[in-house]
Curated annotation (Swiss-Prot):
It comes from Staphylococcus saprophyticus subsp. saprophyticus (strain ATCC 15305 / DSM 20229 / NCIMB 8711 / NCTC 7292 / S-41). It catalyses: Release of the N-terminal residue from a tripeptide. Belongs to the peptidase M20B family. The lineage of its organism: Bacteria, Bacillati, Bacillota, Bacilli, Bacillales. It comes from the Bacteria. Its EC number is 3.4.11.4. GO terms for biological process: peptide catabolic process; proteolysis. InterPro entries: ArgE/DapE_CS, Bact_exopeptidase_dim_dom, Peptidase_M20, Peptidase_M20_dimer, Peptidase_M20B. Binds 2 Zn(2+) ions per subunit. Zn(2+) 2 binds at residues 140, 175, 379. Keywords: Aminopeptidase, Cytoplasm, Hydrolase, Metal-binding, Metalloprotease, Protease, Zinc. One of its GO terms (molecular function) is tripeptide aminopeptidase activity. The gene is pepT. This is Peptidase T.
Length: 410
């Protein structure tokens, strides 16, 4: 199976599927269709019934091979790659039996090293797929796509493995936060599902951040600096003042675990007008609401010193902690936990310091935890995939299909 995984992952990552946050279409880039169409053909070749809509949501069905009434389980992965780094001309490299020493990435000056990425100690002895240093790898989330496809291939070639109805979805635009926006939960018609979009071995994640975006707009008054006294209002300095009033330790680089943060993503402007773009994250819903409230309070405090209120704040929620929807459905976690135990995989249920498509899908009525893929260092040239861990992830998908039968055939 290992060589099959390498071949399939190579085939997928060399197709450029980078999404574009500036686009208003779905998918956001035409090139995402290249992989979607390939997957549609490959699913059909496996004997699955497929359904792809005009917005790039590819669904497929593996019919049940048992005569009992079972819930339908779904597996999902996104096909787009991050816009944060070059995603074209991906040239994957294979490292057999990784020995823990630094790896030079192609002909670049970039080095993949445990000194910088200590999690790589966990994949010593594994076969790795890495980049040549000029692009991201795209294992986020093409590794998840591979794992689902390899599991389907295994199930279709081993009819002795009993399973209920399985639904599969490959989706666009997750990397720009739009993955589930046009996802038709009713058409997908699963009772619960799993995103194959995690990272390190053993991850089984059912808690995510609550997430919002905030746009702070500072309006200034531009006057010639030679006659600016008591007349100029510098929008750049207003933005600086606004950010200084936020808790300086509650930022991504100083938080971990369940700790939330404010993240200043971008500043753009001049004396006349300056905008600050933030993301707000917290696992606790009450703390999340307080964080948003704090931005408004800072705005009001600064504005109170001016006749014309110069600062505006616009806040938009993006997704919520999926744990609120998954915890009332404990079987959705218990099933993969039993599979992990049978396979000897230690389950790591630490919260996601981020979100997945499952964060939004869970609030759309489809409880969807997240499972490891065996990849790390996403969105850049240091991304890598452990083929050994990917092989385990394939076994998890197959195991969940089996465990649904074991759970409900009583």
């Amino acid at each position: 199976m290992k060589q099959d995984i390498i071949d399939r992952l190579t085939r997928y990552v060399t197709i450029d599927t980078q999404s574009n946050p500036e686009s208003t279409t779905t998918p956001s880039t035409e090139k995402q269709w290249d992989l979607l169409n390939l997957l549609n053909d490959e699913l059909t070749d496996l004997g699955l019934e497929t359904d792809i809509d005009e917005q790039g949501y590819l669904f497929a069905t593996l019919d049940s091979n048992v005569d009992i009434d079972l819930p339908t389980v779904g597996f999902l992965a996104h096909i787009d790659t991050s816009p944060d780094f070059n995603a074209s001309h991906v040239n994957p490299q294979i490292i057999d039996n990784y020995d823990g020493t630094p790896i030079q990435l192609g002909k670049t000056n970039r080095t993949l090293s445990q000194d910088v990425f200590p999690a790589m100690k966990n994949v010593e002895g594994h076969t790795l797929m890495i980049t040549d240093g000029t692009s991201l790898l795209g294992a986020d989330d093409k590794a998840g796509v591979v794992e689902i496809m390899e599991a389907l291939k295994y199930l279709t070639s081993h009819p002795e493995i009993k399973h209920g109805k399985i639904r599969v979805a490959f989706t666009p635009d997750e990397e720009i936060g739009r993955g589930p926006h046009e996802f038709d939960v009713e058409r997908f018609n699963a009772d619960f599902a799993y995103t194959m979009d995690g990272s390190e071995y053993g991850e089984l994640q059912y808690e995510s951040f609550n997430a919002a975006e905030a746009i702070v707009t500072c309006h200034g008054v531009n006057v010639h600096p030679g006659s600016a006294k008591d007349a100029m209002i510098n929008a750049v300095l207003l933005g600086q003042q606004f950010n200084a009033l936020l808790p300086q330790n509650e930022v991504p680089e100083r938080t971990e675990g369940y700790e939330g943060f404010y993240h200043l993503m971008k500043i753009n402007g001049d004396v006349e007008k300056t905008t600050l773009q933030y993301i707000i994250r917290d696992h606790d819903r009450n703390e999340f609401e307080l964080r948003k409230k704090r931005l408004v309070e800072i705005k009001n405090d600064i504005n109170s010193h001016f006749e014309d209120e110069p600062i505006e704040v616009e806040i938009n929620d993006q997704y919520y902690n999926m744990g609120e929807k998954i915890e009332p459905n404990p079987h959705v976690i218990d099933i993969p936990k039993r599979v992990f135990e049978k396979l000897g995989i230690p389950a790591n249920t630490a919260p996601i310091r981020g979100g997945t498509d499952g964060s939004q899908l869970s609030y759309m009525g489809l409880p969807t935890p997240n499972i490891f893929t065996g990849c790390d260092n996403f969105h850049g040239p240091f991304e890598y995939a452990s083929i050994d861990v990917m092989e385990k992830a394939v076994q998890v998908v197959v195991g969940i299909a089996e465990e649904v039968v074991n759970t409900y055939d009583k």
